[in-house]
Amino acid sequence: MMLFGKISQQLCGVKKLPWSCDSRYFWGWLNAVFNKVDYDRIRDVGPDRAASEWLLRCGAMVRYHGQERWQKDYNHLPTGPLDKYKIQAIDATDSCIMSIGFDHMEGLEHVEKIRLCKCHYIEDDCLLRLSQLENLQKTILEMEIISCGNITDKGIIALLHLRNLKYLLLSDLPGVREKENLVQAFKTALPSLELKLQLK
């Protein structure tokens, strides 16, 4: 509550800013709130439920192991035993996930596919964090990164740590400039990877 009080004081103290600037500040703050990691919540409900809540709160979708249907409504998250619903796939298209929220993924053990499309807050740090998580290094088989303007070669090269990656699509990433070097690095480190590049 004190945090909200401090932020609201800051917002009230800012005067005569253009509406668009004020609005941008507010939405940036709100997105940061949505991404904040609550470690007590992870402990209480388990990593898959807490990560599901985070992802859906930010506008992403999840699919659970053994299910065909994508879960996209925060208010209709399934209930039941904590170990019943394990995240198998994440579609973060048009979501506001950002690096401060990626600690939610630490305990996930069944994620096989991640799609990051038009994620304006995704940066290299997100991919670096993702590739450092030992569970995800083992389980991720497919990734798609599309139209994420803040991603550069540094973030993409970190994906070499995903040692079981079988399919990687990179599309419309203006910050990725060393295509030939990336192709060579992936061929060397992950020879069975199907790498699809749709880059300028």
Swiss-Prot record:
Mg(2+) binds at G59, T93. Homotetramer. Associates with ATP synthase. Involved in regulation of mitochondrial membrane ATP synthase. Necessary for H(+) conduction of ATP synthase. Facilitates energy-driven catalysis of ATP synthesis by blocking a proton leak through an alternative proton exit pathway. This is ATP synthase subunit s, mitochondrial. The gene is DMAC2L. Coiled coil: none annotated. Keywords: ATP synthesis, CF(0), Hydrogen ion transport, Ion transport, Leucine-rich repeat, Magnesium, Membrane, Metal-binding, Mitochondrion, Mitochondrion inner membrane, Repeat, Transit peptide, Transport. Residues 1-25 form a transit peptide. GO terms for cellular component: mitochondrial inner membrane; proton-transporting ATP synthase complex. It is found in: Mitochondrion; Mitochondrion inner membrane. Its main location: mitochondrion. One of its GO terms (biological process) is proton transmembrane transport. LRR repeats lie at residues 62-87, 88-116, 117-141, 142-173. Residues 1-61 are annotated as: N-terminal domain. One of its GO terms (molecular function) is metal ion binding. The keyword Transferase does not apply. Gene3D superfamilies: Ribonuclease Inhibitor. Belongs to the ATP synthase subunit s family. It comes from the Eukaryota. InterPro entries: LRR_dom_sf.
